[in-house]
Amino acid sequence: MFLGTHTPKLDDKGRLTLPAKFRDALVGGLMVTKSQDHSLAVYPRAEFEQLARRASKMSRSNPEARAFLRNLAAGTDEQHPDMQGRITLSADHRRYANLSKDCVVIGAVDYLEIWDAQAWHDYQQTHEENFSAASDEALGDII
C-alpha cells in the first residue's frame, strides 16, 4: 500500500529517487503515466496491467473511450528503478507535469503520484477546505 508524502529532488538528468519504503513493491517494474491534474501516476507493473485490461474492454466505437485508450498507451513509460531507487522521467512526462527540481511523491493507496512541489501546494490550498465534504460524498456509506 502506498501512503504518505515525500519530497525528492529531480536531478539534471531527469532522474527522481523513489521513497525507499515503496521500492520493494516496485521491484517487478513500474509504469509511469500521465494522470489527472497534470500529475504523473506510478503503478506497479501488475497493477497497471489490470488497469489496461479493464480499459481495453471499453467500447472502441465511443470517441471518448478511444481518446482515453490512446492517451493511456501513448503516455505510459515502463521503468525499472536503478540500484539507488531512481527512475528517469521522460522529457514529455516532465513537461506534462511541469516538473521543476522540487517534486512531491504522494501515496495514493494502490499507486503513487508525482507532482511539481508548487503545483501540489497550490492543489492542496484549493482542495484542503473541501476535504471533509469531498470525503463524505466520495465515501458515502463505506465508512
UniProtKB/Swiss-Prot annotation:
<feature type="domain" description="SpoVT-AbrB 1">
    <location>
        <begin position="5"/>
        <end position="47"/>
    </location>
</feature>
<dbReference type="InterPro" id="IPR003444">
    <property type="entry name" value="MraZ"/>
</dbReference>
<dbReference type="InterPro" id="IPR035644">
    <property type="entry name" value="MraZ_C"/>
</dbReference>
<dbReference type="GO" id="GO:0003700">
    <property type="term" value="F:DNA-binding transcription factor activity"/>
</dbReference>
<protein>
    <recommendedName>
        <fullName>Transcriptional regulator MraZ</fullName>
    </recommendedName>
</protein>
<dbReference type="InterPro" id="IPR037914">
    <property type="entry name" value="SpoVT-AbrB_sf"/>
</dbReference>
<dbReference type="InterPro" id="IPR020603">
    <property type="entry name" value="MraZ_dom"/>
</dbReference>
<feature type="domain" description="SpoVT-AbrB 2">
    <location>
        <begin position="76"/>
        <end position="119"/>
    </location>
</feature>
<dbReference type="GO" id="GO:0005737">
    <property type="term" value="C:cytoplasm"/>
</dbReference>
<dbReference type="GO" id="GO:0000976">
    <property type="term" value="F:transcription cis-regulatory region binding"/>
</dbReference>
<keyword id="KW-0963">Cytoplasm</keyword>
<dbReference type="InterPro" id="IPR035642">
    <property type="entry name" value="MraZ_N"/>
</dbReference>
<keyword id="KW-0804">Transcription</keyword>
<dbReference type="GO" id="GO:2000143">
    <property type="term" value="P:negative regulation of DNA-templated transcription initiation"/>
</dbReference>
<dbReference type="Pfam" id="PF02381">
    <property type="entry name" value="MraZ"/>
</dbReference>
<keyword id="KW-0805">Transcription regulation</keyword>
<comment type="subunit">
    <text>Forms oligomers.</text>
</comment>
<dbReference type="InterPro" id="IPR038619">
    <property type="entry name" value="MraZ_sf"/>
</dbReference>
<dbReference type="InterPro" id="IPR007159">
    <property type="entry name" value="SpoVT-AbrB_dom"/>
</dbReference>
<dbReference type="GO" id="GO:0009295">
    <property type="term" value="C:nucleoid"/>
</dbReference>
<keyword id="KW-0677">Repeat</keyword>
<keyword id="KW-0238">DNA-binding</keyword>
<comment type="similarity">
    <text>Belongs to the MraZ family.</text>
</comment>
